[in-house]
From Swiss-Prot:
A ubiquinone binds at H201. Heme b b566 binds at H97, H196. The keyword Transmembrane applies. It comes from Miniopterus fraterculus (Lesser long-fingered bat). This is Cytochrome b. The gene is MT-CYB. The chain crosses the membrane at residues 33-53, 77-98, 113-133, 178-198, 226-246, 288-308, 320-340, 347-367. Heme b b562 binds at H83, H182.
Length: 379
């Protein structure tokens, strides 16, 4: 009798993806973040589902319904904070996952990389709409400022913004549709994740050396299932520590004030995971230019495979490229810091220099340094 694991139409798909999958024998903990993102998505969908059972998407009651969840619903407070801080964990894992792909040259798997960029955009859109739902001051003004950026699009901009708002300002219609999309998008993301994995399993995983490892593959289970389980444990412990000891650490105090269209907060800023892009947006003193820079700051990832000039895939044996990579990381941290600061001297010029350097490293310096390294290695 054949093993049901290998013969059942449905189970054999799971088997070929999670059990008998041939995996490189040398992938490090940097390859754990894919599965951690899967856990984050599951946590977000589950906590979000239970929150949606008690939340009301109406401008008059949204803020109070979130307060009601925290005060009156059994374990509502932990659901709310798991969901809010789970989003932060999601983005930490996302950025580390993308950084790993950049460092080890995983972007050469172009289909997987491109669907990954679409996933990044989808997660960012979901997080933005989720931030609007509690209907605090930063929710309202964040929604107003970010949606208003679309008015910079020539000719159709104003009509587009009013169409998204469902009126002439951010109001009840906006909140209702944001809730609808915020509920729907994670399931679309889950479907896109399946496609992401489908493309990945067509080619197999990359590894730290960047050299094909087909001749030295090991089964995913038990080796990487146990390794992933350790990752889950560490991440869930970190998330629970954040939720139980300092749940508001990454939030904005302004969001504990109900939304008031007549009172603008002194500093409108998004959640910490968007600050680097927000800093790039603000660094250009022109609305359309800023919006283009904002979109390009993420979209630039799509042309990285075309800019790969090195004869080696990974940066493991390329020390000069490594220096540039870590300069890019430091630059992104600088942009994140600048995004949270007021628009005044010296933050303006620091933000502008960091924004220029961000695009310079990716578009000019990395390809040039790769060519130089080829020359130094006589390739």
């Amino acid at each position: 009798m054949t093993n049901i694991r290998k013969s059942h139409p449905l189970i054999k798909i799971i088997n070929s993806s999670l059990v008998d999958l041939p995996a490189p024998s040398n992938i490090s903990s940097w390859w754990n973040f894919g599965s951690l993102l899967g856990v984050c998505l599951a946590i977000q969908i589950l906590t979000g589902l239970f929150l949606a059972m008690h939340y009301t998407a109406d401008t008059a009651t949204a803020f109070n319904s979130v307060t009601h969840i925290c005060r009156d619903v059994n374990y509502g407070w932990i659901l709310r904070y798991l969901h809010a801080n789970g989003a932060s964990m999601f983005f930490i894992c996302l950025y580390l996952h993308v950084g790993r792909g950049l460092y080890y040259g995983s972007y050469t798997l172009t289909e997987t990389w491109n669907i990954g960029i679409l996933l990044l955009f989808a997660v960012m859109a979901t997080a933005f709409m989720g931030y609007v739902l509690p209907w605090g001051q930063m929710s309202f003004w964040g929604a107003t400022v970010i949606t208003n950026l679309l008015s910079a699009i020539p000719y159709i901009g104003t009509d587009l913004v009013e169409w998204i708002w469902g009126g002439f300002s951010v109001d009840k219609a906006t909140l209702t549709r944001f809730f609808a999309f915020h509920f729907l998008l994670p399931f679309i993301i889950a479907a896109m994740v399946m496609v992401h994995l489908l493309f990945l399993h067509e080619t197999g995983s990359n590894n730290p050396t960047g050299i094909p490892s087909d001749m030295d593959a090991i089964p995913f289970h038990p080796y990487y299932t146990i390794k992933d389980a350790l990752g889950f444990l560490i991440m869930i412990m970190a998330l629970l520590t954040l939720v139980l000891f300092s749940p508001d650490l990454l939030g904005d105090p302004d969001n504990y004030t109900p939304a008031n269209p007549l009172n603008t907060p002194p500093h409108i800023k998004p959640e910490w995971y968007f600050l680097f892009a927000y800093a790039i947006l603000r660094s250009i003193p022109n609305k359309l230019g800023g919006v283009l820079a904002l979109v390009l700051s993420i979209l630039v990832l799509a042309i990285i495979p075309l800019l790969h000039t090195s004869k080696q895939r990974s940066m493991t044996f390329r020390p000069i490229s490594q220096c540039l990579f870590w300069l890019l990381v430091a630059n992104l941290l600088t942009l994140t810091w600048i995004g949270g600061q007021p628009v005044e001297h010296p933050y303006i010029i620091i933000g502008q220099l960091a924004s220029i350097l961000y695009f310079m490293i990716i578009l000019i310096l990395m390809p040039l340094v790769s060519i130089m390294e080829n020359y130094l290695l006589k390739w």
